[in-house]
Amino acid sequence: MSNNTDLSPVHVIGGGLAGSEAAWQIAQAGVPVVLHEMRPVRGTDAHKTEQLAELVCSNSFRSDDAETNAVGVLHAEMRLAGSLIMACADAHQVPAGGALAVDREGFSQAVTARLEAHPLITIEREEITGLPPTEWGTTIIATGPLTAPSLAEAIAAETDADALAFFDAIAPIIHFDSINMDVCWFQSRYDKVGPGGTGKDYINCPMDKEQYEAFVAALIEGDKTDFKEWEGTPYFDGCLPIEVMAERGPETLRHGPMKPMGLTNAHNPTVKPYAVVQLRQDNALGTLYNMVGFQTKLKYGSQTGIFKMIPGLENAEFARLGGLHRNTYLNSPVLLDNVLRLKSRQTLRFAGQVTGCEGYVESSAIGLLAGRFTAAEKLSQAAVPPPPTTAFGALLGHITGGHIVTNDEPGKRSFQPMNVNFGLFPPVDVPKPEGKRLRGKEKTIAKKRALSARALADCRNWLSLY
């Protein structure tokens, strides 16, 4: 690390996981940083301490398996990149089987101590109530899901009021190769061709009356998660949880997101479905499909059991389950460029959960990328995005362009927060053992190993450019 004290500092707003990691990466590159954190001057309903990188929910960073789990691959890539968050997590690990879990107090204290001790990092405890003044120059905004209202309003004013969401409405996402296409079929309603569409842009899952009634009953009876007190109840038109719609009457769903009109079962064209669940392509690769209109507060265990009742989804593998939470985040695919800069004001860069990633590790990873991109620019170097074959690149791609933006559901935005998962990675050729054809679970594991090996090799090559 060489110090460039003659450089003007980079300002980072928000001392959570992403902001802490961004500040560390910038300082480690030799560029001075001012890290602004509003706690303890102003607290939140979720934070309990004034430590940086406080973990407000679980103490788990999820699987540490870097061979067959996408988040484990992201762990490995972050370690290769010199991540502060991963170093402190490893130093404060507690037993959790194959997962990386941490002593939450020890972890956040360690992050705080490392940042406070760094000669190029200045920590300012103050609330930033608006967008940074132009004289600050390059600034990273990493204010997280609980962004203070005044700053959120300023961001909304800069980006357009519709560009900032205050609650996520997450519908489950399914891996395409787990959908039974002997039951389901491709068709848009009334064969309508939308922008960039073919008239066959949805996968349709048909139900007869008996299946529909059993499904509605299961939705109503399923275990549900209550809102936390500070979240309020953010139901609004176009974003009702699927189980709340079911409770409004037995016919509500089949006249709403499950309406069968304009659809003909390609496998049985003479029999009209009583109801239809539609799945819409979620990423440009075509590896992921989301369940249209299926945002939910059902507990995860209930979701998997109930949604596998849907014909064609009996063996569905979920890349993400549904939810509805308090969460401030940008419509990033529209607003941010491929190195996380605001297109309309390129001195502003965003990082962490406010960009639309989901999870501790993912937020930290986007902070790491934002920090590296910013440091490169300050040092008059090129900010080179990671390859899409890496976990870094797959996650960045979802945020800045891999997600397909649609406008066909009034009251909803199609871009929703996402954890890293193998469905975000470009497909890979799976090596076949000589004279043997892989099937089932064996094939799935081989595919994951191939994706992981490619990701780590490509990540090492990318890091060698910096």
Curated annotation (Swiss-Prot):
Cofactor: FAD
Pfam families noted in UniProt: GIDA (PF01134)
Coiled-coil stretches noted in the UniProt entry, renumbered to this chain: none
Keywords: Cytoplasm, FAD, Flavoprotein, Methyltransferase, NAD, NADP, Transferase, tRNA processing
GO molecular-function terms, A-Z: flavin adenine dinucleotide binding; tRNA (uracil(54)-C5)-methyltransferase activity, 5,10-methylenetetrahydrofolate-dependent
EC number(s) reported in the record: 2.1.1.74
Residues that span the membrane, as ranges: none
UniProt GO BP: tRNA methylation; tRNA wobble uridine modification
Primary role: Catalyzes the folate-dependent formation of 5-methyl-uridine at position 54 (M-5-U54) in all tRNAs.
Protein name per the record: Methylenetetrahydrofolate--tRNA-(uracil-5-)-methyltransferase TrmFO
Organism: Brucella abortus (strain 2308)
Gene: trmFO
